[in-house]
Regions:
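An acidic-aromatic loop/edge-strand motif
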Residues: 135-137, 142, 157-160, 172-175, ...
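Short, hydrophobic/aromatic-enriched beta-strand segments in well-ordered soluble domains
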Residues: 268-273, 789-796, 863, 921-928
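C-terminal motif of bacterial Sec signal peptides marking the signal peptidase cleavage site
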Residues: 17-18
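Carbohydrate-binding surfaces of carbohydrate-active enzymes
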Residues: 49, 67-68, 81, 99, ...
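Bacterial N-terminal signal peptides that target proteins for export
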Residues: 1-8
Length: 985
């Protein structure tokens, strides 16, 4: 460091300290202000912490009236903003077509777009937009020159010992585009035939993406039969690379080839590249076209200048960078691509060697041996991922930043395209992922939750917002049960690091499309046309409160997990727990790009932004790159703790034979030459350990768990996330079961008063029950089914102080059951009877009256009852509805006093100040979803059709017709009880 730099840093530090007052500790003052800010914004969150949405403009079919109605509805629910997403998808999976509106980017479409910006500005909402119609970048403007490319070849066998003059056949060509790369020859004698081909070759070459979401891709590093094998009778050769001959100069531009061929049998390969068959997916009508070449910066520049720049120019300075803040592209769902014009040069620059002699692999031949071939293929895929990151996502960010805008592409899966997700995320301004609600299409958690990789990138790169396309499903439609489906999924992903929901979907639907109107074929529909919109505020407010604290917090983790340097590389959901952290510790995920920048301070592993971890955990597949191994040697030497199995081989051909020798030397240096199943080796100031989990390792180093539920070590019953906000510790604790749970929650905090912050209500109270011991605080919590609570530690107390109460939440005793008859009023405008008496509470779908059986909307339950117990003014009394279907949302009024809306189990409201001695009148409004009414209309159960939509409920999620539409249980099912709160003992 130069003397000039030292002086400048001293001046800067002096200036910073001079900005603080000397009369009191500036940290105390800042801390007090921030804490008050947290409390006020928790109770009534600012709009900036609100939810956002994928605002679908399906087939371009929107109107100014519908735009205004939607934006005003968003404002009424305190939305932060909306992401305009022009797309098709309305007619997928057996659903019906809708009219076509203006084409994306056309003059008419852009006029509607600018109108939406004007309205959003008027309402104080932020707008983003997806820069194409459909899922992946491309469209009718993308000519073959700029389209995605793939390798292609032709091959023929010849006999040498003479001069050959041949017309080499053109390889398969798509979309009229082809360019040659190289012509190669290699011996093809029976002696070098092999029966051991490279497995999963099309996947390893990037011709296809892996199926499913967040699959384990590590099998691509080795030779095994997992994945999708293509059966072939083709003869496969094992080729000595030294005998492969580059004959490119022997072929003219017309494919005429001449060669004085040596004796023996030879294979001649003409290798080039053409367009892939990929087309833009799920676009509006007339936006079909080629997928863009994601590896070519010129292709992105062309698309930007042709499509995006004119839209921004139309939006103008009054919107761009202010109302119009972010741009998006959707997740990779465009198949494979494995070549671009400059690929050979880029490969040489990135990997350090020439790739051409390895290209017989595309025909299935083995070059040198299986290990060498697989190592080359790993380098090949890493180069694809590198080019996608630097020539597509980095280029996207550069263009956006020139307009004072940010980007938020879903650039890391969960589909396993040729991506390094963590590297891509480094170019994002908002880190985006997705998660799904439970449904027949995706019932398993590992198929629905993908936030961990995105949140790790945000933590490491210092990005504030971790967003997600949220609550995606593929059918059935409108039958969401908020407490069971949406809240459980939201809380699960909050614990993985989510801090902003983007509702998928919020569809713009013109009035002429009726009610519930046009909808996307997938997603949880949230918009002003759903039956329960008028009661949606508490559900959305809950998410706002949770997001506020999550966005303000700094994540706490002890473990950094390196998930390998292979491509594709998509980390699965948090509970896959590859480092072995759970339950009790948390972790971040990192890739090679970040690992190469790690440092060590006081034994902690430090990322460039300053975040610290206690241990670095390696993947268990025993394959690493030489650069990573060199970096590990440096980290351990300086004092880092590294945990993982001894590597067996290098993932790459980088460094050649010299590199392979260095790799073995470093492995033996770090792990030792002879090791058992478990053990530890000291090197320099640090240690390398193996054979134990990260949790076991940290406990062995006397690092206490960050969070625990005493007596329950389940990884699935409970979850948590820990943030620090200034000097406050903020824990979000989630019950991930359908049962009420009483737990003793143990936190790695002491000397601070625990507070309970209830995101359902905004209530903040000090915990009266807690114990401090061994630098930990144990707080009794009662969590309702899929319930949650923030536990906040802020105010200093004596470390020996203990809470005075036995519990922090009451139990509830039933005093009276409101059984017997209820009068129920349905809305005749939606086909229901104006008034009917239920002798007892019943599921509407079991009623003999079809007007009730197929009803959708709000029904008003009325009941008069006489209190049969003596009220005690010291008690709190509650009305518990217990079971509300199908959305699970209701409002309660007693004796004319509104007691609010309930949407979570057990649907309990405080009626203390409304309940009176003698006769009482209770009114319960219950709202179900559109599902049953749409089903009834589809089956023509009534001469009157009440609904209009493109969605067909008579198909399953695959689009296949079902024999019968099963209706969704609906209504107030009870039992309805009056309960009294009693102190826990």
């Amino acid at each position: 460091m130069s003397w000039k730099t030292i002086c400048w840093e001293a001046i800067l530090l002096g200036f910073l300290f001079s900005c603080t007052g000397s009369d009191k500790d500036p940290m105390d003052r800042k801390y007090q202000i921030d804490y008050d800010y947290l409390k006020s914004n928790f109770q009534q969150p600012d709009r900036t912490y609100g939810v956002n949405c994928w605002w679908w403009w399906l087939n371009g079919n929107v109107t100014k009236e519908a735009i205004t109605k939607d934006l005003e509805a968003m404002k009424s629910r305190n939305f932060q903003g909306a992401m305009i997403f022009d797309a098709g998808g309305h007619n997928q999976r057996g659903n019906k077509d809708i009219p076509a509106g203006p084409l994306f980017g056309s003059e008419e479409w852009t006029e509607l777009f600018v109108f939406a910006l004007d309205e959003a500005k008027r309402l104080g909402l932020e707008i983003g937009f997806n820069i194409q119609s459909g899922w992946n970048l491309g469209g009718p403007c993308v000519t073959p020159q700029y389209a995605a490319k793939q390798l292609t070849y032709s091959e023929r066998k010849v006999t040498g010992g003479k001069t050959l003059r041949l017309q080499l056949a053109e390889p398969d060509i798509y979309k009229g585009f082809y360019k040659d790369i190289v012509v190669l020859a290699f011996p093809s004698n029976k002696e070098n035939k092999t029966n051991e081909p490279v497995s999963n070759l099309d996947l390893k070459l990037g011709f296809h993406e892996l199926g499913g979401s967040a699959p384990d891709c590590r099998f691509l590093l080795e030779n095994n039969t997992r994945g999708r094998e293509k059966k072939t009778d083709k003869t496969i050769y094992l080729i000595d690379i030294a005998r492969i001959v580059d004959l490119t100069t022997q072929m003219d531009e017309k494919g005429l080839f001449s060669w004085d061929a040596p004796e023996g049998d030879w294979n001649i390969m003409r290798i080039g590249y053409t367009c892939t068959r990929s087309e833009v997916s799920t676009s509006s009508r007339d936006w079909q076209g080629n997928v863009l070449d994601y590896m070519d910066r010129n292709a992105f520049d062309y698309y930007w200048n042709t499509i995006v720049e004119p839209i921004l120019q139309a939006a103008g300075e009054k919107h761009v960078g202010s109302t119009l803040k972010f741009m998006e592209t959707d997740s990779w769902e465009c198949g494979g691509m494995n070549w671009t014009d400059a690929f050979a040069d880029e490969f040489r620059s990135y990997c350090g060697y020439d790739l051409k002699l390895y290209l017989p692999l595309i025909a299935g031949h083995v070059v040198d041996n299986i290990d060498t071939s697989n190592a080359f293929l790993a380098d090949f895929r890493k180069t694809i991922a590198h080019l996608v990151a630097t020539n597509h996502y980095a280029c996207f960010a550069e263009h956006a930043h020139q307009h004072n805008m940010g980007i938020q592409p879903e650039s890391a899966g969960p589909h396993a395209g040729p991506l390094d997700g963590m590297k891509n995320y480094g170019f994002s301004d908002i880190v985006m992922s997705e998660f799904w609600s439970p449904s027949p299409h995706r019932p398993r958690p590992q198929d629905r939750f993908f936030i961990k990789q995105a949140s790790s990138a945000a933590h490491i790169y210092g990005k504030k917002i971790v967003g997600a396309e949220s609550f995606t499903t593929i059918g059935p439609h409108w039958n969401d049960e908020l407490w069971h489906d949406q809240k459980s999924a939201f809380d699960h992903e909050i614990c993985a690091g989510l801090n902003r929901v983007y509702f998928h979907t919020f569809t713009c639907s013109p009035a002429e499309q009726g009610i519930p109107g046009q909808e996307y074929f997938a997603g949880t529909h949230v918009n002003p046309r759903v039956t329960w919109w008028s009661k949606s505020a508490p559900f959305i407010d809950y998410m706002h409160r949770v997001q506020m604290l999550a966005q303000e917090g700094t994540f706490v983790a002890d473990i950094l997990y390196y998930y390998g340097d292979h491509v594709p590389n998509v980390y699965p959901f948090k509970h896959s727990d590859m480092p072995g952290a759970m339950f009790g510790f948390d972790y971040d995920v990192t890739d090679e790009n970040i690992l190469m920048k790690l440092g060590v301070k006081d034994g902690d592993i430090v990322v460039p932004g300053g975040r610290k971890y206690k241990v670095l955990v390696l993947p268990d597949h025993r394959i690493l790159s030489l650069p990573v191994l060199k970096k590990l040697e440096m980290l351990v030497k300086e004092g880092a703790s590294v945990l993982g199995p001894k590597p067996q081989k290098a993932v790459s051909l980088f460094g050649g034979e010299k590199g392979a020798a260095e790799f073995k030397k470093l492995v033996d240096l770090l792990w030792g030459t002879t090791i058992g199943t478990t053990g530890q080796n000291q090197y320099g100031k640090g240690f390398v350990s193996w054979g134990i989990t990260a949790k076991e390792y940290l406990l062995s180093r006397n690092q206490p768990v960050d969070f625990a539920v005493e007596g329950n070590d389940s990884k699935t019953d409970f979850d948590y996330i820990h943030y620090v906000i200034d000097d406050a510790h903020v824990y979000f604790v989630s019950n991930q079961t359908t049962e009420r749970q009483k737990i003793d929650a143990c936190f790695r905090v002491s000397g601070l008063q625990p507070e309970l912050w209830n995101a359902l209500t905004g209530e903040i109270r000090e915990a009266g029950a807690f114990t401090q011991k061994d630098e930990k605080t144990v707080v009794p919590l009662t969590l309702e089914p899929y319930g949650s609570m923030f536990v906040v530690f802020h105010k200093k107390i004596d470390r020996n102080k203990q809470g005075a109460k036995a519990g922090n939440d009451p139990d509830y005793e039933i005093l009276q059951t409101l059984d017997g008859a209820w009068t129920v009023n349905f809305d005749p405008e939606w086909g229901g009877p104006s008034s009917v008496v239920f002798p007892e509470l019943i599921d509407w779908t079991r009623h003999s009256d079809k007007r009730i059986k197929y009803f959708s909307g709000t029904a008003v339950y009325n009941k008069k009852f006489t209190v049969n117990f003596e009220k005690n003014p010291a008690n709190r009394y509650y009305l518990q509805l217990e079971n509300v279907k199908d959305v699970g949302i209701a409002s309660v009024c007693i004796n004319g006093k509104d007691k609010g809306i309930v949407w979570t189990k057990p649907f309990r409201v405080d009626i203390t100040d409304g309940l009176k001695e003698g006769e009482n009148d209770v009114v319960v409004e219950v709202t179900n979803s559109w599902f049953n009414r749409v089903a009834g209309d589809e089956m023509a159960v009534s001469p009157t059709k009440y609904t209009q939509t493109n969605i067909v409920l008579g198909n399953d999620f695959r689009g296949n017709a079902v024999s019968e539409i099963t209706l969704e249980p609906s209504g107030l099912l009870g039992p309805v009880t009056i309960q009294v709160a009693v102190e826990q003992k």
